[in-house]
């Protein structure tokens, strides 16, 4: 747990913080880079990758799972269901009715120079989230851009995305007023 002063001392000087707590270990992940890394590793081991292959059924036999598709079956000792909230009901009964899609909206600033980052004492690469009803999360990217996100609306339409983008820009400027340009 950090006081406001301690939080500022580790490299975050936005206007809305009153302190913080930190998860250890905690990190941010780029899902595309993660899955590309897994694919690269699998290919280096001469494994086959079946993209865009719908699993129709999962059966358990002894200590293995059998994933059944129209094209064939795959046997595995372990499986990971990574759906991003778009789960196929009936595939794993324990998950039915428990997974909801969540739309997230993200904006990214231009590359900020050191003076701009220092204006808000933004030094940390740790991901930061607030605890308000409309949660915001943000982090510094390796090239000094700030990724700023929040939950999206329920429709995900182009019109609502544009409105949400403008709203997010306003929130970002409120938290970091010295970046208002």
Q: Which residue ranges define each predicted feature?
A:
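Helical element adjacent to the flavin cofactor pocket in flavoenzyme catalytic cores
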Residues: 18-77
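A short alpha-helix capping/helix-coil boundary motif
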Residues: 14-19, 147-149
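Active-site substrate-recognition segment that forms the wall
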Residues: 55-57, 63-67, 72-115, 119-181
């Amino acid at each position: 747990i950090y006081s406001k002063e301690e939080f500022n001392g580790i490299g975050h000087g936005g206007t809305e913080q009153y302190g913080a707590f930190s998860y250890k270990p905690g990190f941010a992940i780029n899902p595309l880079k993660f899955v590309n890394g897994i694919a690269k590793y699998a290919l280096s081991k001469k494994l086959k990758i079946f993209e865009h292959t719908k699993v129709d059924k999962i059966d358990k036999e002894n200590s293995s799972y059998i994933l059944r598709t129209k094209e064939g079956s795959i046997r595995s000792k372990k499986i990971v269901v990574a759906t991003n909230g778009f789960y196929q009901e009936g595939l794993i009964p324990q998950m039915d009715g428990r997974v909801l899609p969540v739309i997230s909206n993200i904006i990214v600033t231009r590359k900020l120079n050191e003076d701009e980052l220092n204006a808000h004492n933004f030094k940390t690469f740790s991901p930061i989230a607030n605890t308000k009803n409309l949660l915001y999360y943000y982090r510094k990217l390796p090239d000094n851009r700030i990724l700023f996100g929040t939950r999206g609306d329920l429709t995900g339409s182009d019109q609502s995305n544009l409105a949400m983008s403008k709203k997010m820009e306003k929130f970002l400027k409120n938290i970091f007023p010295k970046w208002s340009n």
